[in-house]
């Protein structure tokens, strides 16, 4: 559970008052700037969000009659409010401090500009409060592309990852990949702390990739862009030989590109995955070899049909 205390420590913010409320949970990634509330409109006050008070809000507040100031701040400090942050190093109003002491609402001061701090907070909250899941597989950074290797147990996922590491790529997680959906279409995978940097090879045991290959051979987390699913070669199955068929794998609410690679003796799976990663990058750049080949093939068919008619 994300609490105000963790927010303060992670972002190096300064707590002014309301220490008793540091254990309040933060459940919302949205941040509020209570401008209308300063004017007295609390009908739709999002009290469960972190509140930011910048120059605009406080300059308006200072124009209020003295008899209204205390009531506004008391309404602002609710039991469910995680924190009220005063930005730009501004001095918090005395009425706010009093309301904080009465309701134990944490008051935090920051030197950052309001917009800059809002950006930092949003990034932090989206990461911490993102939806999570875990998958059985191996995550490797191949040419800058986060490749999630999946398949049945014993198919050779870890051995393939070891070969990729030897070829200069970086291991993120083996066996169990913890996945967070940071935003729409952005999945980030990382290993559980218990098996960080470790790789299990049947017949050899558990090896520490960072110790064997150096710090450049591992990553703590990586955005997942491509899924390579390994399966035993099935002679009765028609595999994609051109690349026009687009498969996807849905993880949480995000779909990523999926490629199914049949495995049998003599196939260098690590090299195939390298080529798949490079080809994925080309596709992002708008270069699709399969589509170009299909267009050339259609043009050739049209030319031949015209010749036969003549």
Swiss-Prot record:
Active site annotated at which positions? Answer: 136, 157, 175, 241
Question: For the region Important for the catalytic mechanism of dephosphorylation, what residue ranges are annotated?
Answer: 262-267
Report residues binding ATP.
Answer: 151-158
Q: Which UniProt keywords apply?
A: ATP-binding, Carbohydrate metabolism, Kinase, Magnesium, Metal-binding, Multifunctional enzyme, Nucleotide-binding, Serine/threonine-protein kinase, Transferase
Which Pfam family, just one, is annotated for this protein? Hpr_kinase_N
Molecular function in Gene Ontology = ATP binding; magnesium ion binding; phosphorelay sensor kinase activity; protein serine/threonine kinase activity; protein serine/threonine/tyrosine kinase activity
What GO biological process terms are annotated to this protein in UniProt? regulation of carbohydrate metabolic process
UniProt EC number: 2.7.11.-, 2.7.4.-
Which cofactors go with this protein?
Mg(2+)
State the source organism's domain of life: Bacteria
Indicate which residues the UniProt annotation says bind Mg(2+). 158, 200
Subunit relationships: Homohexamer.
- Which PANTHER family does the entry link to? HPR KINASE_PHOSPHORYLASE, PROTEIN YJDM-RELATED
The note filed under miscellaneous reads:
Both phosphorylation and phosphorolysis are carried out by the same active site and suggest a common mechanism for both reactions.
- Please quote what the entry notes about the protein's domains: The Walker A ATP-binding motif also binds Pi and PPi.
Q: What is this protein called?
A: HPr kinase/phosphorylase
């Amino acid at each position: 559970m994300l609490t105000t205390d963790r927010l303060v420590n992670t972002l190096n913010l300064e707590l002014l008052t309301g220490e008793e409320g540091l254990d309040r949970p933060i459940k919302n990634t949205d941040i509020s700037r209570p401008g209308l509330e300063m004017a007295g409109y609390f009908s739709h006050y999002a009290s469960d969000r972190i509140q930011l008070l910048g120059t605009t809000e406080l300059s308006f507040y200072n124009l209020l009659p003295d008899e209204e100031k205390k009531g506004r701040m008391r309404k602002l400090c609710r039991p469910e409010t995680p924190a009220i942050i005063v930005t730009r190093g501004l001095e918090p109003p005395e009425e706010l401090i009093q309301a904080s002491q009465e309701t134990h609402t944490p008051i935090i001061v920051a030197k950052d500009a309001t917009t800059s701090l809002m950006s930092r907070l949003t990034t932090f909250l989206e990461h911490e409060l993102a939806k999570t899941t875990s998958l059985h597989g191996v995550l490797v950074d191949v040419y800058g592309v986060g490749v999630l290797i999946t398949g049945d147990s014993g198919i050779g996922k870890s051995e393939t990852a070891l070969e990729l590491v030897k070829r200069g790529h970086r291991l993120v997680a083996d066996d169990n990949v913890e996945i967070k959906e940071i935003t729409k279409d952005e999945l980030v995978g990382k290993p559980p702390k218990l098996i960080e940097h470790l790789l299990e090879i049947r017949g050899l045991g558990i090896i520490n990739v960072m110790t064997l290959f150096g710090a450049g051979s591992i990553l703590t987390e990586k955005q997942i862009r491509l899924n390579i699913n390994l399966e035993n070669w099935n002679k009765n199955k028609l595999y994609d030989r051109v690349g026009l068929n687009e498969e996807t794998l849905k993880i949480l609410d995000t779909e990523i590109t999926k490629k199914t690679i049949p495995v049998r003796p003599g196939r260098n799976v690590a090299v195939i995955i390298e080529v798949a990663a490079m080809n994925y990058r080309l596709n992002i750049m708008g270069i699709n070899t399969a589509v170009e080949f299909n267009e050339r093939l259609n043009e050739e068919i049209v030319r031949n049909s015209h010749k036969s008619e003549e």
